């Protein structure tokens, strides 16, 4: 493939939650300024610095893209997307000056600095580009065949579950593709989603990728990410109240739509302390993205029961490094008590027999102030300001990791 062929060919080729979060930013804090930093959590065989020149070219191409009228009409047809927001997107394109790429020793450094209405939208595109550039030299007929073999084995296991176990389950098995950011390639994700949609129509509930959802006529899935909550640490509310402010902001924007709340920005215990009866009734359920999923799920069920809410009326969505096997184990454990669904990423879109990259591009400051996530998993916290991290831990009574 020629080096100047764009990897990203549509601004819809990203996750739905980028659109849903951006709408809140545009309507409620349009002047906010954000800074994002890239990090690779593992040690790839080929240094990512070797991708710098190709990445620069791809970013130039990305920043030439605009939404087509057909794409805007599709977005306008989603009931939670407001018409003035689509009018804004008609004028929208990513500005190249807000993103920079450099080498810091053997590390690839990517930084995004700019208005949140711009900076927020880069992340998924950049991660997908880095992945595809990295794996392109490793792509081969043998790699694709291994990927197909693994995918078909997963489909067979899911079909077996549907046939043999699902009839006895209280709630159905629901699985979605969450794999855009870590995909092997654009065309491979399309193949995976098409196969899931064709083979498992009763199980596969959609994809986070808006382009593929539109193309295949399936449901785009997503609500919010950590960056949405983190921004509220710097938006003028008392730090102790940032989660409640973020949840309230979401409620006011979506009025009952998009009702799955993310819980691990400062840990599940601190989240539940803020997730009172008001929010527990308003939101449809919770999303798990770090820590032990069984402990987390039991805490969620106990919290609903303490509030005298029947857990069977709510949903737990699991999305932390899942495989088909781990999803099925969670389904067996929780479906007698509460509705469950699963967002599977790398295990669907980059299980080719090659070690996947563990790359992230995270919000590190907002309006010039540090922001952070105190994840339920060691190693997922990302903040260079140790003083702010210590203060955040103190405010939410989160013990420091040993």
Curated annotation (Swiss-Prot):
Gene Ontology MF, one: nicotinate phosphoribosyltransferase activity
SUPFAM superfamilies: Nicotinate/Quinolinate PRTase C-terminal domain-like, Nicotinate/Quinolinate PRTase N-terminal domain-like
UniProt xrefs under InterPro entries: N/Namide_PRibTrfase, NAPRTase_N, Nic_PRibTrfase, Nic_PRibTrfase-Fam, Nicotinate_pribotase-like_C
EC numbers, comma separated: 6.3.4.21
Domain of life: Bacteria
Catalytic activity: nicotinate + 5-phospho-alpha-D-ribose 1-diphosphate + ATP + H2O = nicotinate beta-D-ribonucleotide + ADP + phosphate + diphosphate
GO CC terms of this entry: cytosol
Keyword hit for Transmembrane: no
Coiled coil: none
Pathway recorded for this protein: Cofactor biosynthesis; NAD(+) biosynthesis; nicotinate D-ribonucleotide from nicotinate: step 1/1
Entry keyword set: Ligase, Phosphoprotein, Pyridine nucleotide biosynthesis
Keyword presence, Phosphoprotein: yes
Phosphohistidine: modified positions: 226
Biological processes annotated in GO: NAD biosynthetic process via the salvage pathway
Post-translational modification: Transiently phosphorylated on a His residue during the reaction cycle. Phosphorylation strongly increases the affinity for substrates and increases the rate of nicotinate D-ribonucleotide production. Dephosphorylation regenerates the low-affinity form of the enzyme, leading to product release.
Enzyme class: ligase
Record NCBIfam families: NAPRTase, PRK05321.1
HAMAP family recorded: NAPRTase
PANTHER family hit by this protein: NICOTINATE PHOSPHORIBOSYLTRANSFERASE
Described purpose of this protein according to its UniProt entry: Catalyzes the synthesis of beta-nicotinate D-ribonucleotide from nicotinate and 5-phospho-D-ribose 1-phosphate at the expense of ATP.
Family as reported in the entry's similarity comment: Belongs to the NAPRTase family.
Protein name: Nicotinate phosphoribosyltransferase
